[in-house]
């Protein structure tokens, strides 16, 4: 893990993720105001699916921006961009961290409503709405990055 993170981890279960994303969807009502969703790949694909279902939106685009290599944040690379200025669109990502990706998204889609499920202090001012505050130094373990594994008991016979 990068030197900027402490040992603190925030582990997100599928149930928590779904509950928080549905709360975000409620804040985006009425659904009729939206033309579509732009998911920031890859983390934004998961909340985009929930938002699309809850808001009955069928038009889902992607913007693919690479900024992490494993758990290290690096240079931004736009791999694919939805062709719109964002008017009438929700742009969604799972998390805003330092704000580097968010700044690029804002530049690309200035008229979009930009939302995330989780936000850290450095990035939070760059988006329009989010559900959960996360301390800047805390690493988030998203459910799509985890597997269920056996953990041996602390006490052995």
Curated annotation (Swiss-Prot):
Guanine binds at residues 97, 140. CDD domains: PRTases_typeI. Its cofactor is Mg(2+). The keyword Metal-binding applies. GO terms for cellular component: cytosol; plasma membrane. Its EC number is 2.4.2.-, 2.4.2.22. Mg(2+) binds at residue 94. Pathway: Purine metabolism; GMP biosynthesis via salvage pathway; GMP from guanine: step 1/1; Purine metabolism; XMP biosynthesis via salvage pathway; XMP from xanthine: step 1/1. GO terms for biological process: GMP salvage; IMP salvage; purine ribonucleoside salvage; XMP salvage. It is a peripheral membrane protein. GMP binds at residues 97-101, 139-140. One of its GO terms (molecular function) is magnesium ion binding. Keywords: Cell inner membrane, Cell membrane, Glycosyltransferase, Magnesium, Membrane, Metal-binding, Purine salvage, Transferase. It catalyses: GMP + diphosphate = guanine + 5-phospho-alpha-D-ribose 1-diphosphate; XMP + diphosphate = xanthine + 5-phospho-alpha-D-ribose 1-diphosphate; IMP + diphosphate = hypoxanthine + 5-phospho-alpha-D-ribose 1-diphosphate. SUPFAM superfamilies: PRTase-like (SSF53271). It is found in: Cell inner membrane. Belongs to the purine/pyrimidine phosphoribosyltransferase family. XGPT subfamily. Homotetramer. Purine salvage pathway enzyme that catalyzes the transfer of the ribosyl-5-phosphate group from 5-phospho-alpha-D-ribose 1-diphosphate (PRPP) to the N9 position of the 6-oxopurines guanine and xanthine to form the corresponding ribonucleotides GMP (guanosine 5'-monophosphate) and XMP (xanthosine 5'-monophosphate), with the release of PPi. To a lesser extent, also acts on hypoxanthine. This is Xanthine-guanine phosphoribosyltransferase. It comes from Haemophilus ducreyi (strain 35000HP / ATCC 700724). The gene is gpt.
């Amino acid at each position: 893990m990068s030197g900027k993170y402490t040992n603190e981890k925030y582990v997100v279960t599928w149930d928590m993720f779904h509950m928080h994303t549905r709360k975000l969807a409620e804040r985006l009502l009425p659904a009729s105001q939206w033309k579509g969703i732009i998911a920031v790949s890859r983390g934004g694909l998961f909340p985009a699916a929930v938002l699309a279902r809850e808001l009955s939106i069928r038009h889902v685009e992607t913007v693919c921006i690479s900024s992490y290599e494993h758990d290290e944040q690096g240079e931004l690379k736009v791999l694919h961009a939805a062709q719109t200025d964002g008017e009438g669109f929700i742009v969604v990502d799972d998390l805003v961290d330092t704000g580097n990706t968010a700044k690029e998204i804002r530049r690309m889609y200035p008229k979009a409503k930009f939302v995330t499920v989780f936000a850290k202090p450095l990035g939070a001012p760059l988006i329009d709405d989010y559900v959960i505050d996360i301390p800047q130094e805390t690493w988030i373990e998203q459910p799509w990055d985890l597997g269920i594994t056996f953990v041996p008991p602390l006490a052995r016979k």
